[in-house]
């Protein structure tokens, strides 16, 4: 009887936790900047690479290609979140690998927090897994770089 009462009290709480942990597609929408953690000192470096996940299910990745500040879209297409940890991107345009056009790319992701996205994937036709880390770009005043006071 005590076990039954315990289960009746705990089961709904476990269900609430599962619901709270589920990732909603809206939480991925926005502008993300790629970062890289230095292997020597652990410092996080901002890369000149951004990904835009739009509410209409389209995405694009762009970067600054040279010191003059020229930017280009490197990849674009559509995306769909298939579960709490998987996105499938359908590539409709790519300057980095034109053979990807028309193909699907499965991304395994994890939100470390609301503003940090960790992604791993294998590009179609490749055997090595890639790992990326992205941070959300927000409407806020720029922070001072570390070391400048």
Language-model-detected regions and their locations in the chain:
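Lipid interaction determinants
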Residues: 16-74, 88-149
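Short, conserved beta-turn/loop elements at beta-strand boundaries and strand-helix junctions
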Residues: 82-87
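Conserved hydrophobic positions within beta-strands
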Residues: 32, 79-81
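Bacterial Sec-dependent N-terminal signal peptides
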Residues: 1-25
């Amino acid at each position: 009887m005590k076990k039954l009462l315990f289960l009746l009290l705990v089961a709904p709480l476990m269900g609430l936790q599962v619901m709270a942990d589920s990732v909603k597609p809206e939480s991925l929408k926005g502008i993300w900047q790629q970062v890289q953690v230095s292997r020597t000192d652990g410092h996080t470096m901002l890369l000149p690479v951004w990904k835009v996940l739009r509410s209409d299910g389209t995405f694009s990745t762009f970067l600054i290609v040279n010191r003059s500040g020229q930017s280009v879209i490197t990849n674009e297409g559509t995306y769909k979140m298939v579960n709490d940890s998987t996105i499938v991107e359908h590539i409709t345009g790519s300057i980095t690998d034109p053979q990807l056009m028309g193909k699907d790319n499965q991304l395994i992701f994890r939100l470390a927090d609301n503003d940090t996205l960790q992604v791993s994937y294998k590009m179609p036709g490749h055997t090595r897994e890639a790992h990326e880390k992205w941070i959300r770009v927000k409407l806020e005043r720029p922070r001072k770089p570390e070391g400048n006071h």
